[in-house]
A protein has these predicted regions:
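C-terminal substrate-binding subdomain of Rossmann-fold SDR/epimerase-dehydratase oxidoreductases
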Residues: 1-172
Length: 172
């Protein structure tokens, strides 16, 4: 869902798309940054005995909040571009999903480094650059601050581009 939003936002900013169609804006999710989760997986593999862990940020945010943050980051009003389409409602959707990573914090000494607002900025910046636009630049600064030089911004943009829709069609 988040990537659908940030790709569409970039396409809207580039005048390649007019509308983003979404379903339930009130669904809450615990969105996190994949490299943080890979770090947690590495720590799991260092354990002497196998165990189960829940990995997440421990924060839940709605799709509506994501729209507010993503479009607001570019000083845009999402209400002008987002349309609700009932076909995107999921009949069996769980409305609220939030991880409890307390065991991972305690046993693995693991903490996520990237949280909601920063994740959104990383994604928006990367998708703007993928479509050929200049980004505000906060994403690269956030990655450098929290992950240092091992995680390069250009790698972030390239890895996101591997999954991008370059067809020019609207993201619905």
């Amino acid at each position: 869902m988040t990537r659908k939003i940030t790709r569409a936002l970039a396409a809207i900013k580039a005048k390649k798309q007019d509308v983003l169609f979404l379903g339930n804006l009130d669904a809450h999710r615990d969105w996190g940054y994949a490299p943080d989760y890979v770090a947690a997986m590495w720590k799991m593999l260092q354990c002497d005995h196998p165990d189960d862990f829940v990995i997440g940020t421990g924060e839940a945010h709605s799709v509506r909040e994501f729209l507010d943050e993503a479009f607001g980051y570019l000083n845009m009003d999402w209400h002008e571009f987002v349309k609700i389409d009932p076909k995107y409602y999921r009949p069996n959707e769980v409305d609220f999903l939030q991880a409890d990573p307390s065991k991972a914090r305690r046993v693995l000494d693991w903490e996520p480094r990237i949280f909601f607002k920063d994740l959104m900025r990383i994604m928006v910046d990367a998708d703007l650059e993928l479509i050929g636009l200049e980004s505000p630049g906060e994403g690269a600064k956030i990655i450098e601050k929290h992950h240092g030089s091992w995680h390069r911004w250009d790698s972030q943009v390239v890895s996101m581009g591997a999954h991008a829709n370059h067809s020019g069609k609207e993201y619905s």
